[in-house]
């Protein structure tokens, strides 16, 4: 018997071969599908405020340094937002745990810490608000001294390990978050 292969047969055979991985992927057990869904299309890990806080209080923020995202929920939980962030350059610069927003400032000034100046002696002693200021357009100060959630004029930093300990957002995103976040908002840094 002779096997005759025409173009249609070859295309059908190739299509079936290429589709097999997709079919196998759809047939994952439910437990594996749920685990795979924990990351969204932007690769941020999905967070639930209940995993971190007993109540929403005035609102809550989860700053996830691993997936480089900030999650915000308002006081009644009806407003949930997620923002891409910059995170500390090293784990040694990262403070993790619970804190809260204690002060907010539009057009923050910047004074490098002693540790920053030791790492880079060329840093200025003080910097007024403006385009060269690394704190960007808005800053929300945490109860931990020298730790902030702030903007940045250098958009290349977002999504990267680039800060000296703070959580940075695009200026337009920190302005949005600043407007809806009251002093007293609970914060957890992971």
Predicted regions and their residues:
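N-terminal secretory signal peptides and thylakoid transit peptides that target proteins
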Residues: 1-17
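Short N-terminal micro-motifs specific to bacterial/archaeal maturation
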Residues: 1-2, 61, 165
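Short, flexible active-site-adjacent loop segments at beta-strand->alpha-helix junctions, enriched
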Residues: 3, 16, 67, 105, ...
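Sec/Tat signal peptide C-region and signal peptidase I cleavage site
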Residues: 22-24
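Cell wall/extracellular polymer interaction/catalysis modules
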Residues: 27-115, 128-131, 138
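Exported/periplasmic cell-wall-interacting domains
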Residues: 56, 90-98, 109-190
């Amino acid at each position: 018997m002779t096997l005759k292969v025409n173009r249609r047969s070859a295309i059908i055979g190739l299509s079936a071969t290429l589709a097999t991985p997709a079919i196998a992927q759809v047939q994952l057990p439910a437990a594996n599908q749920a685990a795979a869904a924990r990351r969204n299309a932007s690769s941020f890990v999905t967070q639930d405020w209940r995993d971190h806080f007993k109540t929403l209080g005035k609102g809550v923020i989860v700053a996830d340094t691993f997936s480089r995202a900030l999650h915000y929920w308002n006081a009644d939980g009806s407003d949930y937002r997620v923002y891409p962030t910059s995170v500390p350059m090293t784990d040694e610069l990262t403070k993790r745990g619970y804190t809260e927003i204690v002060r907010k400032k539009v057009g923050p000034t910047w004074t490098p810490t002693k540790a920053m100046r030791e790492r880079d002696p060329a840093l200025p002693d003080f910097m007024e608000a403006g385009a060269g200021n690394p704190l960007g357009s808005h800053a929300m100060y945490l109860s931990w001294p020298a730790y902030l959630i702030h903007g940045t004029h250098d958009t290349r930093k977002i999504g990267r390990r680039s800060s000296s300990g703070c959580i940075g957002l695009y200026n337009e995103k920190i302005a949005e978050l600043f407007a809806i976040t009251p002093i007293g908002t609970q914060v957890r840094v992971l």
